[in-house]
A protein has these predicted regions:
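Positively charged
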Residues: 1-163
């Protein structure tokens, strides 16, 4: 396993659509292992392959049970409700924004061996699924947020609100 560099906003790789994974082999396993190590080191809740420079449909999401899920060729197959919530991104460090996302989502994906499965999540897990899957289509949360806040602006705003 190896740490990979997390690509930052402005790199054209983050604006591209990713290709489906067609081979579930050692190369994929190495990528997933590297992404696991990179995400753990960065202390994030999710990481998509394009964030480490690989244009493949693979993401990691930490769910509400603090399990790190690997989703290969994921797709959202159902969703309900809507919540406005705060998001940040490892590719956009130091900035935050409020984004509307579904309150509940159900995903279909494959595991590292190519076995299909479904998973679902609410709240932050649903938000993470949506956020990471958007990366696979070249979209950042900054494209969806009404306003972007610096960490300092957000801290001041939350302090005013008593949070």
């Amino acid at each position: 396993m190896a740490l990979r560099e997390i690509i930052k906003k402005g790199d054209p790789v983050l604006e591209k659509h990713c290709h489906p994974v067609t081979r579930f082999d050692q190369k994929l396993w190495d990528l997933l292992d590297d992404m696991r190590e990179t995400l753990a080191q960065a202390n994030g809740l999710g990481l998509a392959a394009p964030q480490v420079g690989i244009l493949r449909r693979a993401v990691l999401v930490v769910n509400d049970q603090e399990e790190m899920l690997e989703l290969i060729n994921p797709e959202i197959i159902a969703s309900e409700g809507e919540e406005d919530g705060l998001e940040g991104c490892l590719s956009v460090p130091g900035y935050w924004g409020y984004v509307k996302r579904p309150a509940w989502v159900k995903d279909r994906a494959h595991d590292r061996n190519g076995n299909e499965f479904e998973t679902e999540g609410t709240g932050m897990t649903a938000r993470c699924f949506c956020h990471e899957l958007a990366h696979l289509d070249g979209q950042l949360y900054t494209d969806l947020a009404d306003r972007i806040y610096t960490t300092e602006e957000l801290d001041a705003m939350l302090e005013e609100q008593g949070k």
